């Protein structure tokens, strides 16, 4: 039987996926501003900025010229981190909540490495004392 934390975790996962699907649909189907900006970016324009160009327009042009893999990494890494955290809340063992988040995972791996080094140093000191 599921406890309250697991139920709330599943509700959080389902809401997160629903909001993600709605945002994905909005960006790629409904939002005409995004489509207009994408078309402006593709059309050939002179390389010299106009005198009437504002800094926001030039910033939009520069941001749209970034490669796709960079945009994908900027959005997908935090997206998957939040999703994996919500998914870890659905597990039965409360001690395993949050282990899939990158900073926590790195801290655990480094802590295990340090404890392994300390243990190996203790073993080598014991061997020196015994001989």
Swiss-Prot record:
Stored InterPro entries: LYSET
Pfam annotation, one family: TMEM251
Topology with respect to the bilayer: Multi-pass membrane protein
Signal peptide: none
Residue ranges of the TM segments: 8-28, 66-86
Keyword Transcription: no
Entry superkingdom: Eukaryota
GO biological process, one term: regulation of vesicle-mediated transport
Keywords from the named record: Golgi apparatus, Membrane, Transmembrane, Transmembrane helix
Location of the protein in the cell: Golgi apparatus membrane
Keyword Membrane: yes
GO cellular-component term (any): Golgi apparatus
PANTHER family named among the record's database cross-references: LYSOSOMAL ENZYME TRAFFICKING FACTOR, TRANSMEMBRANE PROTEIN 251
Known function: Required for mannose-6-phosphate-dependent trafficking of lysosomal enzymes. LYSET bridges GlcNAc-1-phosphate transferase (GNPTAB), to the membrane-bound transcription factor site-1 protease (MBTPS1), thus allowing proteolytic activation of the GNPTAB. GNPTAB is involved in the regulation of M6P-dependent Golgi-to-lysosome trafficking of lysosomal enzymes. LYSET is thus an essential factor for maturation and delivery of lysosomal hydrolases.
Entry similarity comment: Belongs to the LYSET family.
Record-given protein name: Lysosomal enzyme trafficking factor
High-level lineage: Eukaryota, Metazoa, Chordata, Craniata, Vertebrata
